[in-house]
């Protein structure tokens, strides 16, 4: 009897999550539509629906249209976004990005805080202040549900293994923020979160296997295989920026990110122009003015990136490649150079596109990850709508 009782409980919990999945993935649905989609009888669906409603997961929208055969009009429903909210921090070398989201991923607040040259302790204090600010301003039934930190480094078992750009001073971020705010805290690699964004918010919905190249101060790859994030044995999957390139007579033996990361490109332009104030905007402006030296640097970088994509594709055979890069977002014509270089090497038409929202991609990926976690739905496919 005990085993049977456990089995029934497990089955009901599974079905509750399947119904919640339908409500999340279909912003205006009904009990009858869920019943048809899950192939469960109406009485079972009504019981599960009522349980979710009692737990404040559901917001009813009123009557929908009657079916072609008549009968009562269905009550339409969607996820109650104000069930609770999550917070994601992207700990960047130059800026801290802070985002709060309702349960349906709607953005409540987003802030960018200058952090260049500041120690990790000061950055984490900024994070605390943001959480405290949200706790006083955001009205949600269950308040703060969880926190995600995006780390530009290697994460294994929810701990930072390697942080090349920010000295973490051996601070246990998870332990500190769990103790202070009494919610789950997750750390994840920035490129992995960019890949989750493409899977759950963007065109990645069309692909079961995709790779997102994240090109910032370094270069990493977020890998989605059969709709699941692939981290590797010790969280080091996707550390492609350290791979060596043999493209061109002057690049042999150099790491890819030493040539075509945003930081590397800026530094190369800085040296050629002998201008220490050079930044991303400077590079974009010079390129748009058809500066020959900058065009040469960016052309070479596009060639190296294409070679990197080719190596990744031959290893993992994805359906598509996404590139998350602020520099490329401001010079989108360079995408054509990358595509042409890749097709010259590979002789195929693999889709290679830019992330459509470089500003929010990582933070929204973090929102999705922590939302999956706090709902106990890590292995469920959830689709979120991004505001226009």
Curated annotation (Swiss-Prot):
DNA-binding positions: 31-50
Matching InterPro entries: ATPase_NBD, ROK, ROK_cs, WH-like_DNA-bd_sf, WH_DNA-bd_sf
Alphabetized UniProt keyword annotations: Carbohydrate metabolism, DNA-binding, Repressor, Transcription, Transcription regulation, Xylose metabolism
Protein task: Transcriptional repressor of xylose-utilizing enzymes.
GO molecular function, one term: DNA binding
Region forming the signal peptide: none
Protein name: Xylose repressor
A single BP term in Gene Ontology: D-xylose metabolic process
The organism of origin for this protein: Lactiplantibacillus pentosus
Similarity remark: Belongs to the ROK (NagC/XylR) family.
Lineage: Bacteria, Bacillati, Bacillota, Bacilli, Lactobacillales
């Amino acid at each position: 009897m005990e085993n049977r009782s456990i089995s029934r409980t497990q089955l009901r919990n599974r079905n509750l999550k399947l119904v919640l999945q339908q409500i999340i993935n279909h912003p205006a649905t009904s009990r009858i539509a869920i019943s048809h989609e899950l192939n469960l009888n109406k009485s079972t669906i009504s019981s599960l629906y009522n349980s979710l409603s009692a737990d404040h997961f559901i917001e009813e929208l009123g009557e929908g249209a009657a079916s072609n055969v008549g009968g009562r009009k269905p009550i339409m429903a969607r996820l109650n976004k104000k069930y609770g909210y999550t917070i994601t921090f992207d700990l960047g070398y130059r800026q801290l990005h802070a985002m709060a989201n309702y349960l349906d991923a709607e953005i409540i607040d987003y802030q960018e805080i200058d952090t260049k040259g500041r120690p990790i302790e000061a950055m984490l204090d900024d994070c605390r202040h943001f959480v405290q600010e949200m706790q006083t301003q955001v009205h949600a039934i269950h308040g703060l549900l969880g926190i995600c930190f995006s780390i530009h480094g290697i994460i294994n078992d929810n701990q930072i293994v390697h942080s090349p750009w920010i000295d973490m001073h051996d601070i246990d971020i998870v332990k500190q923020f769990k103790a202070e705010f009494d919610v789950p805290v997750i750390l994840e690699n920035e490129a992995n979160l960019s890949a989750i964004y493409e899977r759950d918010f963007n065109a990645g919905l069309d692909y079961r296997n995709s790779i997102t190249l994240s090109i910032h101060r370094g270069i990493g790859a977020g890998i989605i295989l059969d709709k699941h994030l692939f981290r590797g044995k010790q969280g080091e999957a996707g550390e492609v920026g350290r791979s060596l390139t043999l493209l061109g007579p002057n690049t042999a033996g150099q790491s890819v990110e030493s040539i075509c990361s945003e930081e590397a490109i800026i530094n190369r332009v800085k040296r050629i122009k002998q201008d220490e104030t050079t930044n991303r905007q400077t590079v974009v402006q010079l390129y748009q003015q058809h500066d020959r030296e900058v065009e040469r640097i960016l052309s070479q970088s596009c060639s190296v990136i294409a070679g990197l994509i080719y190596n990744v594709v031959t290893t993992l055979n994805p359906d598509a490649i996404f590139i998350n890069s602020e520099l490329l977002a401001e010079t989108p014509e360079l995408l054509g150079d990358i595509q042409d270089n890749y097709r010259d090497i590979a002789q195929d038409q693999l889709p290679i596109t830019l992330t459509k929202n470089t500003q929010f991609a990582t933070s929204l990926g973090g929102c999705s990850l922590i939302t999956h976690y706090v709902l106990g739905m890590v292995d469920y496919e959830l689709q979120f709508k991004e505001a226009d």
